[in-house]
């Protein structure tokens, strides 16, 4: 027995230097960093994909800014305490992706790379530079830190390398070679049984759009992007998932409710609608095949309204004329908008009534079931309206979600009336004048003059520094 112990000790003593040497040697000869093959400068690919590039560049014509808060000031109250109450414009062309996220009041006016209200994740759907940085630094390296850290790096507008494997021989030959450039999107597709590599061509066409046109949240300390699809893709499934992990995007400053903010869930709503169920893809409607001057077919990258290309989009499947289909879509849009406004009115009252209950001394336990109803009502409303095309993608699902939102909001207000009565408040809670965006912002205590002044200073001083640094580093062509 003693001999065995001695031999074991001798063997161990001989192995220690070996392990030490091997460990040190491994550190010294670590595999080189993976080469960065993502080229973010979109103009690089103009020679091979000339027509596609020019049509993509034409998204700069989609330049109109539409102020959604001015159109509907109720939104300011629903998002009280959240950056969306400051500024929310309807989407413009892809050519404005970087400009719009830089200039929105939501991203604040950071003075340095560690300053500002938002995380790096807020760049994730804006630029092929995101794919480049993820390849270069890994996901943890990319997501780490504040949004301002990415300013000098994320400078090219949403484009080629977001959807295509631009480093592949196939792409160099003029073929599409689609890819999921965001690893978190690939994981989400796998979670719902749709691994990209095994998907058919039609599925892949919509999946690349679904990297960004989708609901997501910021997870963990690094605020990494994750899709909440673990329990399914319907509004109730995602609501259940968020409740299970006790996630909230922010706390409404009036009702003190932990809230959820839907993003832009076009992939989910398209999947639930008649087009998705019949494998009519995003590309079929928004990026149809068109002819160039020589008669050659190519995919139009000026992503837009299908009615603008009726003969190449809707008319491929529908026998009705353009006017007839536009009438149907307009009626659906009006129905959804009418119910949307009714839900918003209920939620506005619920937030102010909840504030009155809290001011009257309502306890956390008394407020919990009410706040749950407000949270769920607004989540369902938001998922329906955040997808700007739901009247086309899934009108029935949109109306269903808004209907359940109305029920939840009514439940909250019924409970609030009972609770307020126990506090001696039986009169109607007065709502301040929120008839304009400015009045609504004043009602929730926003100092918009200061916020706008700080942003203008940021635009004039910080953004030029970012662009100068990007040019020095070869990240911008001009």
Curated annotation (Swiss-Prot):
Cofactor(s) needed by this chain: Ca(2+); heme c
The keyword Chloroplast is annotated on this UniProt entry: no
Predominant location category: periplasm
Annotated residues for binding of substrate: 216, 264
UniProt-listed InterPro entries: Cyt_c552, Cyt_c_NO2Rdtase_formate-dep, Multihaem_cyt_sf
Subcellular localization: Periplasm
UniProt cofactor note: Binds 1 Ca(2+) ion per monomer.
Entry's Gene Ontology BP terms: anaerobic electron transport chain; nitrate assimilation
MF terms (GO), sorted A to Z: calcium ion binding; heme binding; iron ion binding; nitrite reductase (cytochrome, ammonia-forming) activity
SUPFAM superfamilies xrefs: Multiheme cytochromes (SSF48695)
Residues binding heme c 5: 275, 314, 317-318
Amino-acid positions noted as binding heme c 2 in the UniProt annotation, renumbered to this chain: 160, 163-164, 301
EC number, UniProt record: 1.7.2.2
Record's function text: Catalyzes the reduction of nitrite to ammonia, consuming six electrons in the process.
Name listed for the protein in its UniProt record: Cytochrome c-552
UniProt source species: Shigella flexneri
């Amino acid at each position: 027995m003693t001999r065995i112990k001695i031999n074991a000790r001798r063997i161990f003593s001989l192995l220690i230097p070996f392990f030490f040497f091997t460990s040190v040697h491994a550190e010294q000869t670590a595999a080189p960093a993976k080469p960065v093959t993502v080229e973010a400068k979109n103009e690089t690919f103009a020679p091979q994909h000339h027509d596609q590039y020019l049509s993509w560049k034409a998204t700069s014509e989609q330049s109109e800014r539409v102020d959604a808060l001015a159109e509907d000031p109720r939104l300011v109250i629903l998002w009280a305490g959240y950056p969306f109450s400051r500024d929310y414009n309807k989407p413009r062309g892809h050519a404005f992706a970087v400009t719009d996220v830089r200039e929105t009041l939501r991203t604040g006016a950071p003075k340095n790379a560690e300053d500002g209200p938002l995380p790096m994740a807020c760049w994730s759907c804006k630029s092929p530079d995101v794919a480049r940085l993820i390849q270069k630094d890994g996901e943890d390296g990319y997501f780490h830190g504040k949004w301002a850290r990415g300013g000098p790096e994320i400078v090219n507008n949403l484009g080629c390398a977001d959807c295509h494997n631009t480093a592949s021989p196939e792409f160099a030959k003029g073929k599409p070679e689609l890819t999921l450039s965001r690893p978190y999107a690939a994981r989400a597709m796998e979670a719902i049984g749709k691994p990209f590599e095994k998907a058919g061509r039609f599925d892949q066409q919509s999946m690349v759009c679904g990297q960004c046109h989708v609901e997501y949240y910021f997870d963990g300390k690094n605020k990494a992007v994750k899709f909440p699809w673990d329990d399914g893709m319907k509004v109730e499934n995602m609501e259940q998932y968020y409740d299970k992990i006790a996630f909230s995007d922010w706390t409404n400053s009036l009702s003190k409710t932990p809230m959820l903010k839907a993003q832009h869930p076009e992939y989910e709503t398209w999947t639930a609608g008649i087009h998705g169920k019949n494998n009519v893809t995003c590309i079929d409607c928004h990026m149809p095949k068109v002819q160039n001057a020589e008669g050659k077919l190519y995919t139009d990258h000026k992503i837009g309204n299908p009615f603008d290309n009726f003969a190449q989009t809707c008319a491929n499947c529908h026998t009705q004329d353009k006017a007839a289909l536009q009438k149907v879509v307009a009626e659906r849009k009006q129905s959804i908008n009418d119910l949307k406004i009714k839900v918003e009115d209920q939620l506005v009252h619920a937030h102010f009534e909840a504030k009155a209950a809290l001011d009257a001394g309502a306890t956390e336990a008394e407020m919990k079931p009410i706040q749950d109803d407000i949270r769920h009502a607004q989540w369902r409303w938001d998922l329906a309206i955040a997808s700007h095309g739901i009247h086309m993608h899934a009108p029935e699902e949109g109306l269903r979600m808004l209907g359940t939102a109305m029920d939840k909001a009514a439940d909250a207000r019924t409970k609030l009336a009972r609770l307020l009565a126990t506090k001696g408040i039986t009169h109607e809670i007065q709502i301040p004048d929120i008839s304009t965006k400015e009045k609504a912002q004043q009602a929730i205590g926003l100092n918009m003059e200061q916020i706008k002044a700080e942003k203008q200073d940021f635009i004039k001083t910080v953004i030029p520094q970012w662009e100068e640094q990007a040019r020095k580093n070869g990240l911008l062509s001009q």
